[in-house]
Amino acid sequence: MTDIMELIFDELNRRWVYKYETYAPLYVCSAMMHSFNLMNQKRQIYWEGSRLPNMRMHLLFVAPPGFMKTHYLSTMGGDRFAIFKNAGVHVGHEQSLTEAGFIGTIRNVSGVDIIVEGAAQTYANGLMLIDEFSAITSALKVQYNAQMDTQLLAALDHGNVFKRLGGGKIAYQTHLTLWAGVQPARYDLSSGMGRRLGFLLFLPTKYDNDQLRYHMHKARGVRPDENVMNKIWGLLEKNIKNMDIVETVTYGESVYQKYGDMELFSYESSYFDKLLLGWHLMTYGPEKHIVIEAGDELLDKLIGSQKKWRNEIVSGVDYVQVMKLIKVGGIQVAEGFEITLPDLVTQGIMVGWNAHQIHEKIMEMSRQRMVSMKGSVITLLTSSTSVNL
């Protein structure tokens, strides 16, 4: 681990940020790829099949209401003493944003058509942080794919935005990198939108809730350390400026082998290419000739968790959340894990579910033979207990 990552980890640990080892590296990888992409669009040193790729690594934090989505955005980019706030990257932070607010629109004011600039244009070369991005949530849902907004996809993919409205047209290019939060739902990651996003998944258990409350308690009274932050910002800014020294990027055969071992879908490999390059830049800094190889223990852990989260999101995070609540809140029996319905309802309130929603989810899982129910006792069957906590 480089000095910069040790400094960031030490600072997040000092701030009592929960699970920083799990989530913070992805934000740093994304920021490194944002800077690499800006450099590559200008210097054009890395190509794929005679095509200049867009190497941005957008991130969506998927978690129930109240469980760290906004906290991580504020800690990594939004607050005055955030990790990337003064690191040479333009950062914008919005509480919520619609598709029109993100892309832009045209409004008629007293008979005059006026173009209203969207966040994707305002922060065309920056990081855009959005606590709750409803347009992304809609575009990723399975039932929405047929009518997915092509301009939202364009802004996050190649960056060439063109939107024709009754009052005229909007056209611009954006290199914005998106960090946003969304609530758990069943998302289609094979869609155009899903293939271009990285995911951070947090499905809390009672243990997580207790630990998070403890971390919040310990964080009270912790003041910013301006000397440490100035050092972190300086090192990050130096890394960003040094992107211009990169001349070649090569992916070794071990990467191809690793993707095979992980059974990646072909449409996932592009995102994982960015993750590996971001990791390399985060760990070693920019180099003249970058050669990326798989096999680093920490890297394997990072990409393993990313693949696991993607699989869980596709299979249904509501099911995974119920499994985790049963495993942590119940008791182990021969058939699997057992919990009473009242106890599960109590656990479900923590993540924003009411008794009716819990009962519906249990009925769905029972039909799929993931759980069995006798009276008020629910058993998570052994065949369904492979979910990691």
Which role does the model predict for each range below?
Residues 1, 95, 125-126, 329-334:
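Exposed regions on extracellular, virion, or secretory-pathway luminal proteins
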Residues 12, 16-25, 31-211, 342-344, ...:
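Conserved ASCE/P-loop NTPase catalytic core
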